């Protein structure tokens, strides 16, 4: 199977920061 890992993800629209340094880890079998 597989897993998903996102580290230090940020999103901004222009100068407006929506999210900053988000981490997400989904282990095998959790999705």
Swiss-Prot record:
Signal peptide: none annotated. It is found in: Cell inner membrane. The keyword ATP-binding applies. GO terms for molecular function: ABC-type maltose transporter activity; ATP binding. The keyword Nucleotide-binding applies. Keywords: ATP-binding, Cell inner membrane, Cell membrane, Membrane, Nucleotide-binding, Sugar transport, Translocase, Transport. Its EC number is 7.5.2.1. Transmembrane segments: none annotated. It comes from the Bacteria. It catalyses: D-maltose(out) + ATP + H2O = D-maltose(in) + ADP + phosphate + H(+). One of its GO terms (cellular component) is plasma membrane. InterPro entries: P-loop_NTPase. It is a peripheral membrane protein. Belongs to the ABC transporter superfamily. Maltooligosaccharide importer (TC 3.A.1.1.1) family. Part of the ABC transporter complex MalEFGK involved in maltose/maltodextrin import. Responsible for energy coupling to the transport system. The complex is composed of two ATP-binding proteins (MalK), two transmembrane proteins (MalG and MalK) and a solute-binding protein (MalE). This is Maltose/maltodextrin import ATP-binding protein MalK. The lineage of its organism: Bacteria, Pseudomonadati, Pseudomonadota, Gammaproteobacteria, Enterobacterales.
